[in-house]
Structures are given as C-alpha cells and as structure tokens.
From Swiss-Prot:
Domain of life of the source: Bacteria
Key word DNA damage present: yes
Assigned protein family: Belongs to the RecO family.
Keywords tagged on the record: DNA damage, DNA recombination, DNA repair
Main function: Involved in DNA repair and RecF pathway recombination.
Pfam families for this protein: RecO_C (PF02565), RecO_N (PF11967)
Stated name of the protein: DNA repair protein RecO
Gene Ontology CC, one term: bacterial nucleoid
Coiled coil start-end: none
GO biological-process terms attached to the record: DNA recombination; double-strand break repair
Gene: recO
C-alpha cells in the first residue's frame, strides 16, 4: 500500500553501497524504518530528503516487511540547525531519545507535534535548552517513566515541594524529605515550572528566560533521573556534556524567570 506521510528523519544508516535505511518520526503512523534506494548517490533525488532532521512529505510503500520510500518532497530543511554545532547537538539528543524510547508504529500526533515545534523553535531562536527539556519530559511520560512533579511522590501533598528524589521518582514535600537524604534541593517555584514544562504545549509558551544555574540544575536532575529509569545508553548526550551553551537574556515576549 502506498501512503503519503509527513515526517522527520531522526536516524540514517548506510544500507549496502548505494542505499540508506532511515528512521522517520511521522504524524500518521509514528516511528518507522524505511529503505531509501539509491539515496547515497550524489545526484539521487532521494539524497535531499534523507538527510538528518529533514521534514519531508514521503510517499512510502508500506508492506509486511521493510517499508520503501518511493519519492519525497522537502517541507523544511531546518538549515540553521544543521549548520550550527550547538543546535545540531541538541536535536541529535532529542532524535536519539525519541528513537530509543518510542515503540515502532505507535502513533502519537501530540508528541510528534511537540517534536516538530521544538525543532522550529531551535531553528529560529537562540534559546535551546528549555524547549528540549519540555519535549524530554513529555517523552518520558509517553515511555512510561515520567517523574511525579505535581505532588509529593510519597504522600501526595501538593504543598511544600522542596526536594527532587531520584530514588522516589519525583518531588518530595518537606515532611517526606527524610525518606531520601540524597534528594536534590529545588525551590517550590522551580518545581512548579518543571511541572508546567511537562504539561504545556510548546506553542503556548512565549520567550523563556531562566537563570543559567537553574537550567543546569534541571538538566542535572533529568540526566540522573534518566540514568535511573531510562534503560538505554544515549550516545549523543556525551556531546552535550562537552558543550557550554550560552543562555541568552530574553527581553521581549512572555517569559518565565526563576
């Protein structure tokens, strides 16, 4: 069956001398693998639509075995991302997480839209950390191991959330903090912001401003949390660990400042 599918290339792999095997995150059938015949040939029409992070409209033959791309049309090349080492590193991280955590052909239009909107944001804005954090939290929820952020993970209390416990799987209130002496201190305001990031559509967020140390704290929490519950080694994270990102001061638009 020939299907018209809009999607984003999240992984590519050489297949034989002239072909590519690509992984596409789509708005119609979720994540799937497809063979792009001749895509490694320099003059192939397939070469342009099988580059990493390309958003394209694919005409794909979906069969019982490996799907095959018949043709494609580039919708958005995200050129700025692909020409910027920092933005490329972040999107590579997002793409690898998505590939590792999503089951094949399990459609989720909302998550796909968040992935696409995050790429648009990164392509057009200087701020890259926070949109990725927002997507990451939603992806954890889809994968079934989201942290408890709206209430205490021990007693359900929604007030006085002051510690994040990797061991307990989320926030702890002041009364339950003793359950994990190694829990990470986090302000109540920042904990509320983290919960907001996990729930809200990126399109509803204006420009975002956060102190660099708070961004780094959230990143530390999510890294340690993923290491405990994620189950897959993420190769691209090593590149992020080696990069010191500039967090700009955003002066215009809606902002969250903590």
């Amino acid at each position: 069956m020939l299907e018209k599918i809009d999607g984003i290339i999240i992984k590519t792999k050489d297949y034989g001398e002239t072909h590519k095997l690509v992984t596409i995150f789509s708005n119609k059938i979720g994540k799937f693998n497809a063979l792009a015949k001749g895509a490694k040939k320099p003059k192939s029409r397939m070469a342009a639509v099988t580059q990493p992070f390309i958003n394209a409209r694919f005409f794909v033959y979906i069969g019982s075995g490996l799907s095959t791309i018949q043709q494609g049309e580039v919708l958005d090349s995200f050129r700025i991302i692909r020409e910027d080492i920092f933005k490329t590193a972040y999107v590579s991280y997002m793409a690898e997480l998505t590939d590792k955590l999503l089951d094949a052909k399990e459609n989720d239009p909302f998550l796909y839209e968040q992935f696409y909107q995050t790429l648009l944001w990164i392509n057009n804005q200087d701020e890259v950390d926070i949109p990725v954090i927002m997507y990451e939290l939603k992806l954890y929820k889809k994968a079934g191991f989201a942290p408890v952020l709206h209430q205490c993970s021990r007693c359900g209390n929604q007030e006085g959330l002051s510690k994040f416990s990797i061991r307990e799987g989320g926030m702890l209130c002041q009364q339950c903090a003793y359950f994990d002496p190694e829990a990470i201190h986090i302000s109540e305001k920042l904990s509320r912001l983290l919960y907001l990031f996990s729930e809200v559509d990126l399109k509803r967020i204006g420009n975002i401003r956060m102190k660099k140390e708070n961004v780094q704290l959230i990143r530390k929490i999510l890294y340690e949390y993923y290491d405990q519950y994620g189950g897959f080694w993420i190769k691209s994270r090593k590149v992020l660990d080696q990069l010191d990102f500039f967090i700009p001061n955003v002066k215009n638009g809606n902002s969250y400042n903590e």
